[in-house]
């Protein structure tokens, strides 16, 4: 499981979509590329099930396919990574709204395309993960969310492989002249106990790429897991002055950063500083940029030279 997954997007829940999109574009990091394209059309009946709370209370709706779609999401193209920015009203009514009320804005799910959505979903269910959202058309799953929040407080969302329309849309976004030539590396997930979190995600089918080790520059110990083509870094803060400790104290466990490999780290830092970015930590190997004002997420650049 996960070896043949393709990243679809990182899902950030916010209260102000435009503010989040503007932040990344103003800093020269991301380009607002509009909502995601429609799922492939198939005539028939759709079914939508979702938890009204994080812990349950499911509801089911049925609909005829082909009706109008109210696009609410925005998307920021950051390098070759798509960041979905979805506005929600904090409070009761849907599990994501409750998540937003408890933690504030932030990335709460990672969406992948998989050639075996039914088999992969079954694997998660067998490991005790609840199916908190499931959309089907004529009985076939087109999108779901699985509750993998036990460690790391992040959910996994699965979709079937993208069709040519969506693939072309993504390729066109990446060719925009303002999109940075950044290569998406992965996400950093702050956790209370790196060892326990590692064991949990290995049981879910993630692959261990680097054992737990320390970074004194960041004030953390962390390990690298691989899921699909991306790194899933579990980060346990060890220093009180670490920015990752700040993230943990404010929001608890969860995705704290998005990381990208860049060819010229010094040049990228200079460009971002000229646009008003705040540099938190930098070495010859990486730089940490503070973009928590909208979305509670840091950008980390890795020297790929």
Report the location of each language-model feature.
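Accessory recognition modules or surfaces
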Residues: 2-13, 17-20, 27, 33-72, ...
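Short, solvent-exposed secondary-structure junction/capping segments
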Residues: 29-30, 206
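A cross-kingdom feature marking solvent-exposed beta-strand/loop segments within repeated
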Residues: 36-62, 90-109, 127, 132-143, ...
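N-terminal beta-strand motif that seeds the catalytic metal site of vicinal oxygen chelate
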Residues: 1-21, 30-33, 105-112, 162-199, ...
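Vicinal oxygen chelate
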Residues: 7-15, 63-66, 70-82, 84-86, 97-180, 221-226, 231-233, ...
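Conserved active-site tyrosine of GNAT-family acetyltransferases
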Residues: 20-25, 124, 197-202, 272
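Beta-hairpin (beta-strand-turn-beta-strand) motif
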Residues: 81, 88-91, 113-115, 237, ...
């Amino acid at each position: 499981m996960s070896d043949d997954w393709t990243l679809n997007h990182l899902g950030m829940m916010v209260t102000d979509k435009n503010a989040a999109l503007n932040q990344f574009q103003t800093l020269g990091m991301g380009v607002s590329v509009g909502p995601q394209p429609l799922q492939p059309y198939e005539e028939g009946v759709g079914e939508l099930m979702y938890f009204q709370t994080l812990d349950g209370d499911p509801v089911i709706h049925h609909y005829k396919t082909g009706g109008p779609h109210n696009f609410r999401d925005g998307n920021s193209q950051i390098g070759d990574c798509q960041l979905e920015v979805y506005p929600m009203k904090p409070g009761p009514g849907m599990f994501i709204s409750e998540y937003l009320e408890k933690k504030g804005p932030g990335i709460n799910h990672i969406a992948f395309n998989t050639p075996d959505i039914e088999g992969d979903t079954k694997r998660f269910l067998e490991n005790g993960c609840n199916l908190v959202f499931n959309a089907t058309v004529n009985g076939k799953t087109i999108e779901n969310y699985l509750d993998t929040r036990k460690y790391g407080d992040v959910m996994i969302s699965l979709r079937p492989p993208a069709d040519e329309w969506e693939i072309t849309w993504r390729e066109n976004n990446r060719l925009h002249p303002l999109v940075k030539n950044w290569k998406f590396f992965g996400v950093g997930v702050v956790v209370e106990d790196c060892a326990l979190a590692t064991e949990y995600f290995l049981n879910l089918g993630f692959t261990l790429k680097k054992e737990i080790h320390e970074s004194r520059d960041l004030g953390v110990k962390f390990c690298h897991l691989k899921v699909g083509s991306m790194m899933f870094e579990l980060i346990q803060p060890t220093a009180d002055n670490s920015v990752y400790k700040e993230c943990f104290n404010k929001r608890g466990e969860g995705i704290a950063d998005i990381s990208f490999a860049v060819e010229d780290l010094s040049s990228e830092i200079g460009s971002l500083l000229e646009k008003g970015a705040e540099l938190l930590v930098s070495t010859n190997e990486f730089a940490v940029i503070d973009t928590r004002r909208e979305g509670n997420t840091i950008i980390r650049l890795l020297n790929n030279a």
